[in-house]
Design a protein with these regions (language model features):
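Short beta-strand element of the alpha/beta-hydrolase
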Residues: 1-7
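Catalytic nucleophile-loop/oxyanion-hole region of alpha/beta-hydrolase
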Residues: 13-15, 20, 33-70
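Short alpha-helix in the alpha/beta-hydrolase fold that links the catalytic acid
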Residues: 17, 140, 149, 163-173
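Primarily recognizes the serine-hydrolase "nucleophile elbow" in alpha/beta-hydrolase
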Residues: 54-122, 135-136, 140
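Acidic catalytic loop of the alpha/beta-hydrolase fold
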Residues: 114, 158-162
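Active-site nucleophile elbow and catalytic-triad environment of alpha/beta-hydrolase enzymes
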Residues: 128-143, 148-149
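Short beta-strand/loop motif that positions the catalytic acidic residue
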Residues: 147, 152-155, 159
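C-terminal catalytic histidine-bearing segment of alpha/beta-hydrolase fold enzymes
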Residues: 164-193
Length: 193
């Protein structure tokens, strides 16, 4: 199953990064679904992360009934949805024992860091504050471990919304942890293309 996690800066779930992407995977023969998660003021207290973990758990619970391989669940996260997908693989949800994790990640121009190259608006929506210190809770490049699932990621060098440094920081962390990954960096292309 490929579970598509659209972006939208945690302000909305982008329609063009949801069903159209899922339909492309379906046309290639994959089971697909699109995660619609809490955004705006509803996104506080890591609710989107909880919803993603619950979705993965639900798919595994019904895997036989839905004819899905429970150990082959990939998340396709786009932009802020890439942050959410990567969070689902590496971020510990407080008070959630046996947190369901994906088996692979497909990330398109993901938000990764709350540091120098952050997409500040995503972190402000997620935390409800402009306080950069509060954003650090959701930075991900320092949470990569050898247990992180394999990653495919792509980004464009001229993305001005989510700087390519987000992907470069991720790649460095994946390399240091020995996590299998493949990356495609394109010279041209604005955010969302």
């Amino acid at each position: 199953l490929v579970l598509v996690v659209p972006g939208g800066g945690y302000t909305h779930v982008s329609p063009r990064e949801g069903d159209p992407v899922a339909l492309q995977f379906a046309a290639a023969g994959y089971h697909t679904a699109v995660l619609h998660y809490a955004v705006g003021d509803s996104a506080r207290d890591a609710l989107p992360m909880r919803q993603l973990a619950q979705a993965i758990g639900l798919v595994r619970q019904h895997a036989e009934q839905w004819n899905i391989l429970p150990d082959q669940i990939a998340l396709c996260g786009i932009s802020a949805g890439g942050h959410l997908a990567l969070s689902g693989a590496v971020w510990e949800i407080p008070d959630m024992a046996d947190q369901p994790r994906p088996n692979a990640l497909l990330l398109a121009y993901p938000v990764v860091t709350a540091g120098e190259y952050a997409h500040r608006d995503s972190f402000a929506q997620l935390t409800g504050t402009q306080d950069v210190a509060a954003h650090q809770r959701f930075t991900l490049e320092d949470k990569i471990t050898p247990a992180t699932p394999p990653v495919f990621v792509w980004h464009t060098m001229e993305d001005e919304t989510v700087p390519v440094e987000n992907t470069l920081l991720l790649l460095n962390a994946l390399h240091k942890a020995g996590v299998p990954c493949e990356a495609h960096l394109f010279e041209k292309g604005r955010h969302g293309t």
